[in-house]
Amino acid sequence: MSKRILVVENQPDSRQIIRDMLVPTDYEINEAENGEQALAAIAKQRPDLILMDIQLPIMDGYAATRRIKADPALRSIPIIAVSSYALNGEEEIARAAGCDDYVPKPFSPRQLLAKIRQYLS
């Protein structure tokens, strides 16, 4: 059975880059454009891993991550923050919100795929 990855990203081009990177793998890919859609997608089908952009409309990645990690049934899902928000301390803020890892944009597809495999192996 293939592992499920939820890609939470509001930029279509960024979703496409991630989708293109994951298509050759055996992962099942679901997508959401904001934190609210992510929570709805998780309620329908629990992912094995979440790639979470931080700057999202409606509900940002921090708020969505906090909601996911507050739920005992969901808190074990690894969340990798993928963000172009390049403030000093951004990784620490993401981890404080509950993200398990952090990958800055632009990212190396090889680096991101290695992190995904690390959490799904």
Kindly label every feature range from the protein language model.
Residues P12-N30, K44, Y119:
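Two-component/phosphorelay signaling modules centered on CheY-like receiver
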Residues F107-I116:
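C-terminal output helix
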Residues P57, R75, L87, K105-P106:
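The feature encodes the CheY-like receiver
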Residues A32-E33, L56-M59, I68, G89:
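Hydrophobic residue at a beta-alpha junction
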Residues E9:
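Conserved acidic carboxylate
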Residues Q45-L51, L56:
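Active-site beta3 strand of CheY-like receiver
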